[in-house]
Curated annotation (Swiss-Prot):
EC number: 3.1.-.-
Taxon lineage: Bacteria, Pseudomonadati, Pseudomonadota, Alphaproteobacteria, Rickettsiales
Superkingdom of this protein's organism: Bacteria
Provenance organism: Rickettsia felis (strain ATCC VR-1525 / URRWXCal2) (Rickettsia azadi)
Protein name (Swiss-Prot/TrEMBL): Ribonuclease VapC2
HAMAP family the record matches: VapC_Nob1
Cofactor: Mg(2+)
């Protein structure tokens, strides 16, 4: 199984509970793939770039990333993005562009998206969700 972590879960893990998260990630990684989308990586890198403690935060991010697989957003993902965006617009549902890209990526990879933003993502059909922020 592929678990694809959303940006908010990564930030939570890095800043709030690194030891317990790292232990859980290592256990899960024995039988599963723990990954992030390259879209999530871009959001995390943006967070580092705008922070006041760039070196410290880059180091924390690098340590966190060393435990994960980074999956590039591919041409296959663009199909799901186009379909999802059209469907949601027709229903009058607005979802942030990056969130829609991340959701499309998770669906294309047949991954479970791990997020604490269930309210936003539950509107997306065929997206498997879990919340580890408990």
């Amino acid at each position: 199984m592929i678990y694809m972590l959303d940006t908010n879960i990564c930030v939570y893990a890095i800043n709030k509970h690194p030891d317990s998260y790292y232990n859980n990630l290592e256990l899960l990684a024995k039988n599963n793939t723990i990954a992030i989308s390259s879209i999530v990586l871009a959001e995390l890198q943006y967070g580092v770039s705008k922070s006041k403690k760039k070196e410290q935060n880059q180091s924390k991010l690098d340590i966190f990333l060393s435990r994960l697989e980074i999956i590039d957003f591919s041409a296959k993902c663009t199909f799901y993005y186009g379909e999802l965006r059209t469907e949601l617009e027709q229903k009058g549902l607005i979802i942030g562009n990056n969130d829609l890209l991340i959701a499309s990526h998770a669906i294309a990879e047949n991954a479970t998206l791990v997020t604490n933003n269930i309210k936003e993502f539950k509107r997306i059909p065929n997206l498997i969700l879990e919340n580890w922020d408990k």
